[in-house]
């Protein structure tokens, strides 16, 4: 059975979710476990990892409550203010929740593109290992050049890059992204989520072959031990159904060995997040 390593839930609020633009109207509504669980069952998915959207500790409360009520949610990636003076105290607080596995900051939205390298931010990252937490790196491709230095500073900290670092699949731009993500992948404490690809493609005219060059790069760079499958529910709905989105990776990995497929669809996410 497969585990979906990346999805979201929210109670839609136009002010809080201003990033959901007019052209993304398909996701301008509430998305909750009752909406997602039937989709998982239809697609042979046995569990999932719920990832933060809002950058508040209220978001953690919301996610942890859903995880407590829904057994299919095997882990939660929350948010804390990594630059706060009391960061260690906040990390200690969340240890009481067995399903809290790691944290994420929406670096892709920061005006300071190199925020990850700022001393206060790095101080927060430095504390994660003590409590056994992972860190999800959410960035755009222009930030990959800082990411190599960032992950090199914490060789014992587990990181995972979300959504292949969002290459421009629509315009088939690959060269600079390829060079940068290969450099990051040299650090063996870094994994990559093969997730969210359709949202970086031409939403209305994408073809499966659009994704192959990017998948080739990531699989070769990270190997089959450091990649994991994620859907990015419900964001992919702007461009595909779950079945259409998953068929991209099902088709691509169909020629891989059973063991390699098992790693990608299940084992790696369990090992990474200690599910």
Language model: regions and residue ranges:
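Mid-domain alpha/beta scaffold segments of enzyme catalytic cores
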Residues: 1-131, 142, 175, 248-249
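Mid-to-C-terminal alpha-helical segments outside catalytic/metal-binding sites
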Residues: 1-3, 21, 25-47, 217, ...
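Short active-site segment of divalent metal-dependent hydrolases/proteases
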Residues: 9-10, 166, 235
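Active-site phosphate/pyrophosphate- and oxyanion-stabilizing loops and adjacent acidic/basic residues
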Residues: 37, 64-65, 92, 148-149, ...
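N-terminal cationic-hydrophobic initiation segments that often serve targeting/anchoring roles
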Residues: 40, 67-68, 95, 151-152, ...
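Short, electropositive alpha-helical surface patch
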Residues: 58-73, 155, 160-161, 212-220, ...
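Catalytic pocket-lining loop regions of alpha/beta-barrel enzymes
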Residues: 115-228
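Active-site glycine-centered loops adjacent to acidic/histidine catalytic or metal-binding residues
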Residues: 232
């Amino acid at each position: 059975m497969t585990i979906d390593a990346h999805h979201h839930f929210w109670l839609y609020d136009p002010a809080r979710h201003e990033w959901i633009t007019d052209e993304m109207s398909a996701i301008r509504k509430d998305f909750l476990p009752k909406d997602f669980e039937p989709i998982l069952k239809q697609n042979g998915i046995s569990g999932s990892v719920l990832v933060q959207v809002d950058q508040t500790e209220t978001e953690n409360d919301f996610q942890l409550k859903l995880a407590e009520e829904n057994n299919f949610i095997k882990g939660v990636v929350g948010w804390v203010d990594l630059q706060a003076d009391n960061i260690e105290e906040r990390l200690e607080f969340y240890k009481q929740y067995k399903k809290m596995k790691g944290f994420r900051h929406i670096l892709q939205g920061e005006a300071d593109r190199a925020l990850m390298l700022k001393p206060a931010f790095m101080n927060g990252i430095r504390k994660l290992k003590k409590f056994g937490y992972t860190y999800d790196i959410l960035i755009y491709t222009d930030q990959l050049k800082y990411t190599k230095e960032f992950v090199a500073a914490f060789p014992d900290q587990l990181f995972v890059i979300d959504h292949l670092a969002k290459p421009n699949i629509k315009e088939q731009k690959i060269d600079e992204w390829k060079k940068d993500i290969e450099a990051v992948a040299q650090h063996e404490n870094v994994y990559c989520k093969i997730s969210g690809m359709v949202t970086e493609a031409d939403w209305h005219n994408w073809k499966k072959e659009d994704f192959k060059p990017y998948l080739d790069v990531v699989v070769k760079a990270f190997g089959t031990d450091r990649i994991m499958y994620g859907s990015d529910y419900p964001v992919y709905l702007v461009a595909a159904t779950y079945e259409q989105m998953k068929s991209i990776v099902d088709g691509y990995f169909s020629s891989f060995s059973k063991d390699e497929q098992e790693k990608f669809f299940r084992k790696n996410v369990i090992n990474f997040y200690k599910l």
